[in-house]
Swiss-Prot record:
Coiled coil: none annotated. It comes from Mycobacterium tuberculosis (strain ATCC 25618 / H37Rv). Its EC number is 1.14.-.-. Keywords: Acetylation, Heme, Iron, Metal-binding, Monooxygenase, Oxidoreductase. Its cofactor is heme. Belongs to the cytochrome P450 family. This is Putative cytochrome P450 136. InterPro entries: Cyt_P450, Cyt_P450_CS, Cyt_P450_E_grp-IV, Cyt_P450_sf. The modification N-acetylalanine is found at residue 2. One of its GO terms (molecular function) is oxidoreductase activity, acting on paired donors, with incorporation or reduction of molecular oxygen. Heme binds at residue 439.
Length: 492
Protein backbone atom coordinates (compact mmCIF):
# COMPACT_ATOMS: atom_id res chain seq x y z
CA UNK A 1 0.00 0.00 0.00
CA UNK A 2 1.28 3.47 -0.89
CA UNK A 3 2.30 5.66 2.03
CA UNK A 4 3.54 9.21 2.57
CA UNK A 5 7.05 9.63 3.97
CA UNK A 6 6.99 12.48 6.53
CA UNK A 7 10.38 14.03 5.61
CA UNK A 8 9.47 14.19 1.92
CA UNK A 9 6.03 15.60 2.78
CA UNK A 10 7.47 18.28 5.07
CA UNK A 11 10.04 19.27 2.46
CA UNK A 12 7.32 19.56 -0.19
CA UNK A 13 5.16 21.71 2.11
CA UNK A 14 8.13 23.94 2.91
CA UNK A 15 8.78 24.51 -0.79
CA UNK A 16 5.13 25.39 -1.38
CA UNK A 17 5.01 27.84 1.51
CA UNK A 18 8.41 29.47 1.41
CA UNK A 19 9.45 29.60 -2.25
CA UNK A 20 9.18 33.35 -2.97
CA UNK A 21 6.31 34.32 -5.27
CA UNK A 22 3.68 37.01 -5.67
CA UNK A 23 1.25 34.68 -3.90
CA UNK A 24 3.11 33.82 -0.69
CA UNK A 25 5.51 36.71 -0.09
CA UNK A 26 4.63 38.47 3.21
CA UNK A 27 2.44 41.52 2.78
CA UNK A 28 1.44 40.82 -0.84
CA UNK A 29 -2.28 40.88 -0.10
CA UNK A 30 -1.88 44.42 1.26
CA UNK A 31 0.17 45.42 -1.80
CA UNK A 32 -2.51 43.97 -4.07
CA UNK A 33 -5.23 45.90 -2.25
CA UNK A 34 -3.26 49.14 -2.58
CA UNK A 35 -2.65 48.58 -6.30
CA UNK A 36 -6.33 47.96 -6.97
CA UNK A 37 -7.07 51.33 -5.37
CA UNK A 38 -4.27 53.22 -7.14
CA UNK A 39 -5.11 55.37 -10.16
CA UNK A 40 -2.15 55.24 -12.53
CA UNK A 41 -1.64 57.87 -15.27
CA UNK A 42 -3.63 56.87 -18.33
CA UNK A 43 -2.41 56.85 -21.92
CA UNK A 44 -3.78 55.95 -25.34
CA UNK A 45 -2.57 52.95 -27.30
CA UNK A 46 -2.76 54.97 -30.54
CA UNK A 47 -4.78 57.78 -32.09
CA UNK A 48 -7.51 56.49 -34.43
CA UNK A 49 -7.34 57.62 -38.07
CA UNK A 50 -9.12 60.96 -38.59
CA UNK A 51 -12.73 60.50 -39.61
CA UNK A 52 -12.79 56.80 -38.75
CA UNK A 53 -15.25 57.25 -35.91
CA UNK A 54 -13.22 54.81 -33.83
CA UNK A 55 -12.31 55.31 -30.19
CA UNK A 56 -8.75 55.06 -28.83
CA UNK A 57 -7.95 52.20 -26.47
CA UNK A 58 -7.00 53.69 -23.10
CA UNK A 59 -5.06 52.15 -20.23
CA UNK A 60 -1.98 52.54 -18.08
CA UNK A 61 1.43 51.02 -17.39
CA UNK A 62 0.93 50.04 -13.76
CA UNK A 63 4.12 49.64 -11.75
CA UNK A 64 7.52 50.12 -13.41
CA UNK A 65 8.70 46.86 -15.04
CA UNK A 66 6.07 44.72 -13.26
CA UNK A 67 3.06 46.51 -14.73
CA UNK A 68 -0.07 44.83 -13.33
CA UNK A 69 1.60 41.44 -12.89
CA UNK A 70 0.91 41.31 -9.15
CA UNK A 71 -2.83 41.84 -9.62
CA UNK A 72 -2.96 39.34 -12.51
CA UNK A 73 -1.02 36.53 -10.86
CA UNK A 74 -2.83 36.88 -7.55
CA UNK A 75 -6.32 37.67 -8.75
CA UNK A 76 -6.58 36.01 -12.15
CA UNK A 77 -10.20 36.27 -13.36
CA UNK A 78 -11.17 38.42 -10.36
CA UNK A 79 -8.74 41.14 -11.44
CA UNK A 80 -9.99 40.95 -15.02
CA UNK A 81 -13.56 41.28 -13.78
CA UNK A 82 -12.44 44.40 -11.90
CA UNK A 83 -11.03 45.81 -15.16
CA UNK A 84 -14.18 44.92 -17.08
CA UNK A 85 -16.42 46.66 -14.55
CA UNK A 86 -14.26 49.76 -14.12
CA UNK A 87 -12.75 50.29 -17.59
CA UNK A 88 -14.92 48.41 -20.07
CA UNK A 89 -14.39 45.58 -22.57
CA UNK A 90 -11.25 46.89 -24.34
CA UNK A 91 -8.37 47.98 -22.07
CA UNK A 92 -4.74 48.84 -22.85
CA UNK A 93 -1.97 47.53 -20.60
CA UNK A 94 1.36 49.25 -21.32
CA UNK A 95 3.49 46.54 -19.73
CA UNK A 96 7.25 46.64 -20.14
CA UNK A 97 7.23 42.84 -20.49
CA UNK A 98 4.30 42.42 -22.88
CA UNK A 99 2.19 45.47 -23.82
CA UNK A 100 -1.22 44.50 -25.08
CA UNK A 101 -4.96 45.00 -25.14
CA UNK A 102 -7.36 43.02 -22.96
CA UNK A 103 -10.44 41.96 -24.95
CA UNK A 104 -13.02 41.30 -22.23
CA UNK A 105 -16.50 39.83 -22.47
CA UNK A 106 -18.15 37.40 -24.91
CA UNK A 107 -18.66 40.01 -27.66
CA UNK A 108 -14.93 40.68 -27.78
CA UNK A 109 -14.23 36.94 -27.64
CA UNK A 110 -16.51 36.39 -30.63
CA UNK A 111 -14.56 38.88 -32.73
CA UNK A 112 -11.22 37.32 -31.71
CA UNK A 113 -12.18 33.67 -32.11
CA UNK A 114 -14.29 33.94 -35.27
CA UNK A 115 -11.65 36.19 -36.93
CA UNK A 116 -13.88 36.68 -39.96
CA UNK A 117 -11.54 39.09 -41.73
CA UNK A 118 -8.34 37.30 -40.67
CA UNK A 119 -7.22 40.39 -38.77
CA UNK A 120 -5.83 38.39 -35.84
CA UNK A 121 -2.78 36.15 -35.94
CA UNK A 122 -1.64 33.47 -33.49
CA UNK A 123 1.70 35.30 -33.28
CA UNK A 124 0.44 36.84 -30.06
CA UNK A 125 1.55 33.61 -28.38
CA UNK A 126 5.15 33.92 -29.58
CA UNK A 127 6.46 36.37 -26.94
CA UNK A 128 5.05 34.13 -24.20
CA UNK A 129 5.65 30.52 -25.27
CA UNK A 130 7.17 30.79 -28.75
CA UNK A 131 10.76 29.80 -27.86
CA UNK A 132 9.52 26.73 -25.99
CA UNK A 133 6.69 25.52 -28.24
CA UNK A 134 8.03 26.67 -31.60
CA UNK A 135 5.64 25.92 -34.50
CA UNK A 136 3.19 23.98 -32.40
CA UNK A 137 -0.26 23.79 -34.00
CA UNK A 138 -1.64 26.62 -31.87
CA UNK A 139 1.11 28.97 -33.09
CA UNK A 140 0.43 28.46 -36.82
CA UNK A 141 -1.78 30.73 -38.90
CA UNK A 142 -4.33 30.68 -41.69
CA UNK A 143 -3.58 28.35 -44.63
CA UNK A 144 -0.51 26.78 -43.01
CA UNK A 145 -2.51 26.07 -39.87
CA UNK A 146 -5.29 24.39 -41.84
CA UNK A 147 -2.75 22.28 -43.79
CA UNK A 148 -1.23 20.98 -40.55
CA UNK A 149 -4.59 20.58 -38.82
CA UNK A 150 -5.98 18.41 -41.64
CA UNK A 151 -3.10 15.98 -41.29
CA UNK A 152 -3.19 15.98 -37.49
CA UNK A 153 -6.95 15.48 -37.41
CA UNK A 154 -6.38 11.94 -38.68
CA UNK A 155 -4.71 11.19 -35.34
CA UNK A 156 -7.86 12.19 -33.43
CA UNK A 157 -10.63 10.39 -35.35
CA UNK A 158 -12.95 8.21 -33.28
CA UNK A 159 -11.23 4.92 -34.14
CA UNK A 160 -7.87 6.33 -33.01
CA UNK A 161 -9.40 7.73 -29.82
CA UNK A 162 -10.76 4.28 -28.99
CA UNK A 163 -7.23 2.89 -29.15
CA UNK A 164 -5.85 5.70 -26.98
CA UNK A 165 -8.64 5.11 -24.44
CA UNK A 166 -7.70 1.46 -24.03
CA UNK A 167 -4.11 2.45 -23.27
CA UNK A 168 -4.93 5.29 -20.89
CA UNK A 169 -7.37 3.11 -18.92
CA UNK A 170 -4.59 0.58 -18.28
CA UNK A 171 -2.43 3.31 -16.75
CA UNK A 172 -5.24 4.95 -14.77
CA UNK A 173 -6.56 1.70 -13.29
CA UNK A 174 -3.12 0.69 -12.04
CA UNK A 175 -2.07 4.08 -10.64
CA UNK A 176 -5.35 4.88 -8.88
CA UNK A 177 -5.43 1.43 -7.28
CA UNK A 178 -1.77 1.03 -6.33
CA UNK A 179 -0.01 4.40 -6.13
CA UNK A 180 -2.43 6.75 -4.39
CA UNK A 181 -2.47 7.08 -0.61
CA UNK A 182 -5.71 6.35 1.27
CA UNK A 183 -7.10 7.60 4.59
CA UNK A 184 -4.49 10.36 4.84
CA UNK A 185 -5.30 14.10 4.82
CA UNK A 186 -1.75 14.80 3.64
CA UNK A 187 -2.43 13.23 0.22
CA UNK A 188 -2.18 15.96 -2.44
CA UNK A 189 -4.38 15.50 -5.47
CA UNK A 190 -2.69 17.98 -7.80
CA UNK A 191 0.82 16.45 -7.91
CA UNK A 192 -0.75 12.98 -8.01
CA UNK A 193 -2.89 13.98 -11.00
CA UNK A 194 0.09 15.59 -12.70
CA UNK A 195 2.18 12.45 -12.31
CA UNK A 196 -0.72 10.34 -13.60
CA UNK A 197 -1.36 12.45 -16.69
CA UNK A 198 2.36 12.43 -17.47
CA UNK A 199 2.34 8.63 -17.19
CA UNK A 200 -0.62 8.55 -19.57
CA UNK A 201 1.10 10.89 -22.00
CA UNK A 202 4.31 8.85 -21.84
CA UNK A 203 2.42 5.76 -22.95
CA UNK A 204 -0.28 7.13 -25.24
CA UNK A 205 1.79 9.88 -26.86
CA UNK A 206 5.34 8.54 -26.75
CA UNK A 207 4.82 4.77 -26.74
CA UNK A 208 6.64 3.99 -23.48
CA UNK A 209 5.10 1.07 -21.60
CA UNK A 210 4.49 1.82 -17.89
CA UNK A 211 7.58 1.10 -15.82
CA UNK A 212 9.97 1.00 -18.78
CA UNK A 213 12.67 3.55 -19.60
CA UNK A 214 12.03 5.10 -16.19
CA UNK A 215 15.11 7.33 -16.09
CA UNK A 216 14.57 8.66 -19.62
CA UNK A 217 10.84 9.21 -19.18
CA UNK A 218 11.44 11.02 -15.88
CA UNK A 219 13.98 13.33 -17.52
CA UNK A 220 11.63 14.08 -20.44
CA UNK A 221 8.64 14.70 -18.17
CA UNK A 222 10.69 17.08 -16.02
CA UNK A 223 11.67 18.98 -19.18
CA UNK A 224 7.99 19.38 -20.09
CA UNK A 225 7.24 20.84 -16.68
CA UNK A 226 10.12 23.33 -17.00
CA UNK A 227 9.10 24.50 -20.48
CA UNK A 228 5.48 24.95 -19.44
CA UNK A 229 6.42 27.26 -16.57
CA UNK A 230 9.18 29.15 -18.42
CA UNK A 231 6.76 31.26 -20.45
CA UNK A 232 5.79 33.20 -17.33
CA UNK A 233 9.34 34.22 -16.42
CA UNK A 234 9.73 37.87 -15.48
CA UNK A 235 13.44 37.91 -16.37
CA UNK A 236 13.58 36.79 -20.01
CA UNK A 237 17.21 36.05 -20.69
CA UNK A 238 19.17 33.02 -21.85
CA UNK A 239 21.66 33.60 -19.03
CA UNK A 240 21.78 30.94 -16.27
CA UNK A 241 20.25 30.22 -13.82
CA UNK A 242 17.04 32.07 -14.71
CA UNK A 243 13.75 30.32 -15.54
CA UNK A 244 13.84 31.42 -19.19
CA UNK A 245 17.29 29.85 -19.59
CA UNK A 246 16.09 26.61 -17.98
CA UNK A 247 13.15 26.55 -20.38
CA UNK A 248 15.43 26.89 -23.40
CA UNK A 249 17.64 24.04 -22.16
CA UNK A 250 14.57 21.87 -21.55
CA UNK A 251 13.31 22.61 -25.07
CA UNK A 252 16.67 21.47 -26.48
CA UNK A 253 16.43 18.21 -24.53
CA UNK A 254 12.91 17.60 -25.86
CA UNK A 255 13.97 18.28 -29.44
CA UNK A 256 16.82 15.78 -29.16
CA UNK A 257 14.56 13.17 -27.60
CA UNK A 258 11.77 13.44 -30.16
CA UNK A 259 14.16 13.66 -33.12
CA UNK A 260 15.59 10.29 -32.12
CA UNK A 261 12.12 8.83 -31.46
CA UNK A 262 10.79 9.95 -34.85
CA UNK A 263 13.57 8.07 -36.61
CA UNK A 264 12.61 4.95 -34.63
CA UNK A 265 8.86 5.23 -35.25
CA UNK A 266 8.75 6.15 -38.96
CA UNK A 267 8.58 2.51 -40.06
CA UNK A 268 7.41 0.97 -36.78
CA UNK A 269 3.96 -0.25 -35.83
CA UNK A 270 2.07 1.02 -32.82
CA UNK A 271 -1.04 2.82 -31.59
CA UNK A 272 0.73 5.63 -29.76
CA UNK A 273 0.23 9.18 -31.03
CA UNK A 274 3.87 9.63 -32.06
CA UNK A 275 3.76 6.57 -34.33
CA UNK A 276 0.42 7.69 -35.75
CA UNK A 277 1.78 11.15 -36.60
CA UNK A 278 4.85 9.58 -38.21
CA UNK A 279 2.65 7.59 -40.58
CA UNK A 280 -0.48 9.73 -41.02
CA UNK A 281 -1.21 11.57 -44.26
CA UNK A 282 -4.13 13.59 -45.53
CA UNK A 283 -6.37 12.76 -48.51
CA UNK A 284 -3.77 14.21 -50.89
CA UNK A 285 -0.94 12.12 -49.47
CA UNK A 286 0.72 14.98 -47.54
CA UNK A 287 2.73 13.94 -44.46
CA UNK A 288 4.55 15.77 -41.69
CA UNK A 289 8.30 16.29 -41.92
CA UNK A 290 10.45 15.07 -39.04
CA UNK A 291 10.80 18.64 -37.77
CA UNK A 292 7.02 19.11 -37.92
CA UNK A 293 6.44 16.02 -35.80
CA UNK A 294 9.01 17.12 -33.22
CA UNK A 295 7.38 20.55 -32.90
CA UNK A 296 3.85 19.17 -32.73
CA UNK A 297 4.69 16.48 -30.17
CA UNK A 298 6.34 18.96 -27.82
CA UNK A 299 3.29 21.20 -28.00
CA UNK A 300 0.73 18.38 -27.74
CA UNK A 301 2.40 16.91 -24.67
CA UNK A 302 2.17 20.26 -22.92
CA UNK A 303 -1.40 20.94 -24.02
CA UNK A 304 -2.67 17.48 -23.14
CA UNK A 305 -1.32 16.77 -19.69
CA UNK A 306 -1.50 20.26 -18.17
CA UNK A 307 -5.14 20.92 -19.08
CA UNK A 308 -6.20 17.43 -17.99
CA UNK A 309 -4.35 17.79 -14.69
CA UNK A 310 -6.03 21.11 -13.94
CA UNK A 311 -9.53 19.90 -14.80
CA UNK A 312 -9.30 16.55 -13.01
CA UNK A 313 -7.93 18.27 -9.89
CA UNK A 314 -10.75 20.81 -9.83
CA UNK A 315 -13.34 18.08 -10.36
CA UNK A 316 -11.92 16.05 -7.46
CA UNK A 317 -12.26 19.08 -5.19
CA UNK A 318 -15.81 19.88 -6.31
CA UNK A 319 -16.95 16.28 -5.85
CA UNK A 320 -15.43 16.18 -2.37
CA UNK A 321 -17.07 19.51 -1.51
CA UNK A 322 -20.46 18.45 -2.90
CA UNK A 323 -21.20 14.87 -1.77
CA UNK A 324 -24.60 14.84 -3.49
CA UNK A 325 -22.93 15.33 -6.87
CA UNK A 326 -20.25 12.81 -5.97
CA UNK A 327 -22.93 10.21 -5.27
CA UNK A 328 -24.84 11.07 -8.43
CA UNK A 329 -21.70 10.56 -10.52
CA UNK A 330 -20.81 7.39 -8.61
CA UNK A 331 -24.24 5.90 -9.25
CA UNK A 332 -23.66 6.25 -12.99
CA UNK A 333 -20.17 4.76 -12.69
CA UNK A 334 -21.50 1.87 -10.61
CA UNK A 335 -23.99 1.01 -13.33
CA UNK A 336 -21.05 0.50 -15.67
CA UNK A 337 -18.91 -1.34 -13.12
CA UNK A 338 -15.24 -2.21 -13.33
CA UNK A 339 -15.24 -3.66 -16.82
CA UNK A 340 -13.22 -2.32 -19.75
CA UNK A 341 -14.05 1.21 -20.83
CA UNK A 342 -14.98 2.33 -24.31
CA UNK A 343 -16.11 5.64 -25.73
CA UNK A 344 -19.77 4.66 -25.65
CA UNK A 345 -19.67 3.77 -21.94
CA UNK A 346 -17.95 7.05 -21.05
CA UNK A 347 -20.54 8.99 -23.04
CA UNK A 348 -23.19 7.56 -20.71
CA UNK A 349 -21.57 9.20 -17.67
CA UNK A 350 -23.58 12.36 -18.22
CA UNK A 351 -23.34 13.70 -14.67
CA UNK A 352 -19.55 13.69 -14.97
CA UNK A 353 -19.95 15.81 -18.11
CA UNK A 354 -21.96 18.35 -16.12
CA UNK A 355 -19.42 18.41 -13.29
CA UNK A 356 -16.58 18.75 -15.80
CA UNK A 357 -18.22 21.70 -17.54
CA UNK A 358 -18.95 23.46 -14.26
CA UNK A 359 -15.44 22.79 -12.95
CA UNK A 360 -13.73 24.26 -16.01
CA UNK A 361 -16.14 27.18 -15.95
CA UNK A 362 -15.11 28.06 -12.41
CA UNK A 363 -11.41 27.25 -12.88
CA UNK A 364 -10.63 27.50 -16.59
CA UNK A 365 -7.32 25.75 -17.40
CA UNK A 366 -6.41 28.05 -20.30
CA UNK A 367 -7.30 31.45 -18.86
CA UNK A 368 -6.40 33.53 -21.91
CA UNK A 369 -6.06 33.44 -25.70
CA UNK A 370 -3.26 35.46 -27.29
CA UNK A 371 -3.53 37.12 -30.69
CA UNK A 372 -1.71 39.83 -32.68
CA UNK A 373 -3.22 42.13 -35.29
CA UNK A 374 -1.82 41.66 -38.81
CA UNK A 375 -3.26 44.98 -40.04
CA UNK A 376 -4.97 48.07 -38.65
CA UNK A 377 -8.41 47.01 -37.48
CA UNK A 378 -11.10 47.70 -34.90
CA UNK A 379 -12.52 45.82 -31.93
CA UNK A 380 -15.97 46.79 -30.69
CA UNK A 381 -15.44 50.29 -32.05
CA UNK A 382 -11.90 50.71 -30.67
CA UNK A 383 -8.91 51.27 -32.95
CA UNK A 384 -6.15 48.64 -32.97
CA UNK A 385 -3.05 49.34 -35.07
CA UNK A 386 -1.10 46.59 -36.82
CA UNK A 387 1.15 44.60 -34.47
CA UNK A 388 -1.02 45.01 -31.36
CA UNK A 389 -1.07 42.09 -28.93
CA UNK A 390 -4.68 41.27 -28.07
CA UNK A 391 -5.68 38.88 -25.28
CA UNK A 392 -9.14 37.37 -24.81
CA UNK A 393 -9.95 36.00 -21.36
CA UNK A 394 -12.43 33.10 -21.33
CA UNK A 395 -11.72 32.51 -17.63
CA UNK A 396 -13.31 35.88 -16.84
CA UNK A 397 -16.16 35.44 -19.31
CA UNK A 398 -17.14 32.25 -17.50
CA UNK A 399 -17.98 34.32 -14.40
CA UNK A 400 -20.05 37.13 -15.88
CA UNK A 401 -23.27 37.62 -13.85
CA UNK A 402 -25.17 38.78 -16.94
CA UNK A 403 -24.71 35.28 -18.37
CA UNK A 404 -24.31 32.95 -15.39
CA UNK A 405 -26.74 32.77 -12.45
CA UNK A 406 -24.79 33.13 -9.18
CA UNK A 407 -21.57 32.72 -11.17
CA UNK A 408 -19.32 31.78 -8.23
CA UNK A 409 -21.67 28.99 -7.10
CA UNK A 410 -21.02 25.37 -8.12
CA UNK A 411 -24.18 24.50 -10.05
CA UNK A 412 -23.73 21.89 -12.81
CA UNK A 413 -27.46 21.97 -13.59
CA UNK A 414 -26.91 25.31 -15.34
CA UNK A 415 -25.72 23.27 -18.35
CA UNK A 416 -28.99 21.32 -18.65
CA UNK A 417 -32.38 22.01 -20.21
CA UNK A 418 -34.18 24.32 -19.88
CA UNK A 419 -31.54 26.63 -18.38
CA UNK A 420 -28.67 26.11 -20.85
CA UNK A 421 -26.84 29.16 -19.51
CA UNK A 422 -23.82 28.37 -21.68
CA UNK A 423 -25.96 29.07 -24.75
CA UNK A 424 -26.98 32.59 -23.75
CA UNK A 425 -24.14 33.84 -25.93
CA UNK A 426 -22.33 31.87 -28.61
CA UNK A 427 -19.01 32.65 -26.94
CA UNK A 428 -20.13 32.59 -23.31
CA UNK A 429 -18.43 29.23 -22.69
CA UNK A 430 -15.14 28.65 -24.51
CA UNK A 431 -12.86 26.51 -22.32
CA UNK A 432 -11.39 24.88 -25.43
CA UNK A 433 -11.13 28.06 -27.49
CA UNK A 434 -13.19 28.75 -30.57
CA UNK A 435 -13.15 29.14 -34.32
CA UNK A 436 -10.62 27.30 -36.49
CA UNK A 437 -8.21 27.08 -33.55
CA UNK A 438 -10.60 25.23 -31.24
CA UNK A 439 -8.62 22.58 -29.36
CA UNK A 440 -7.99 19.61 -31.65
CA UNK A 441 -7.56 17.33 -28.63
CA UNK A 442 -10.78 18.35 -26.86
CA UNK A 443 -12.43 14.92 -27.05
CA UNK A 444 -9.18 13.20 -26.07
CA UNK A 445 -8.97 15.40 -22.96
CA UNK A 446 -12.59 14.71 -22.04
CA UNK A 447 -12.13 10.95 -22.38
CA UNK A 448 -8.97 11.04 -20.27
CA UNK A 449 -10.56 13.10 -17.50
CA UNK A 450 -13.70 10.96 -17.35
CA UNK A 451 -11.60 7.79 -17.26
CA UNK A 452 -9.67 9.12 -14.26
CA UNK A 453 -12.77 10.23 -12.36
CA UNK A 454 -14.69 7.04 -13.17
CA UNK A 455 -11.92 4.81 -11.79
CA UNK A 456 -11.48 7.12 -8.81
CA UNK A 457 -15.17 7.04 -7.88
CA UNK A 458 -15.36 3.27 -8.25
CA UNK A 459 -12.66 2.76 -5.61
CA UNK A 460 -12.97 5.71 -3.23
CA UNK A 461 -15.12 8.27 -1.51
CA UNK A 462 -13.56 11.73 -1.79
CA UNK A 463 -13.53 13.93 1.32
CA UNK A 464 -12.15 17.38 2.04
CA UNK A 465 -9.11 17.45 4.30
CA UNK A 466 -11.15 19.64 6.67
CA UNK A 467 -14.78 20.82 6.51
CA UNK A 468 -13.96 24.47 5.77
CA UNK A 469 -11.24 23.77 3.19
CA UNK A 470 -11.18 26.02 0.12
CA UNK A 471 -8.25 26.09 -2.32
CA UNK A 472 -6.29 29.19 -3.24
CA UNK A 473 -5.13 29.35 -6.84
CA UNK A 474 -1.84 30.41 -8.38
CA UNK A 475 -2.61 32.02 -11.76
CA UNK A 476 0.98 32.37 -12.96
CA UNK A 477 0.30 29.80 -15.72
CA UNK A 478 -2.59 27.36 -15.76
CA UNK A 479 -4.35 27.65 -12.38
CA UNK A 480 -2.62 25.53 -9.73
CA UNK A 481 -3.80 24.98 -6.12
CA UNK A 482 -1.05 26.56 -4.06
CA UNK A 483 -1.18 23.88 -1.35
CA UNK A 484 -1.36 20.96 -3.79
CA UNK A 485 -5.04 20.29 -2.96
CA UNK A 486 -5.25 17.87 0.01
CA UNK A 487 -8.11 15.39 -0.46
CA UNK A 488 -8.79 12.26 1.61
CA UNK A 489 -9.45 9.03 -0.32
CA UNK A 490 -11.67 6.63 1.65
CA UNK A 491 -11.79 3.07 0.25
CA UNK A 492 -15.37 2.00 -0.44
Amino acid sequence: MATIHPPAYLLDQAKRRFTPSFNNFPGMSLVEHMLLNTKFPEKKLAEPPPGSGLKPVVGDAGLPILGHMIEMLRGGPDYLMFLYKTKGPVVFGDSAVLPGVAALGPDAAQVIYSNRNKDYSQQGWVPVIGPFFHRGLMLLDFEEHMFHRRIMQEAFVRSRLAGYLEQMDRVVSRVVADDWVVNDARFLVYPAMKALTLDIASMVFMGHEPGTDHELVTKVNKAFTITTRAGNAVIRTSVPPFTWWRGLRARELLENYFTARVKERREASGNDLLTVLCQTEDDDGNRFSDADIVNHMIFLMMAAHDTSTSTATTMAYQLAAHPEWQQRCRDESDRHGDGPLDIESLEQLESLDLVMNESIRLVTPVQWAMRQTVRDTELLGYYLPKGTNVIAYPGMNHRLPEIWTDPLTFDPERFTEPRNEHKRHRYAFTPFGGGVHKCIGMVFDQLEIKTILHRLLRRYRLELSRPDYQPRWDYSAMPIPMDGMPIVLRPR
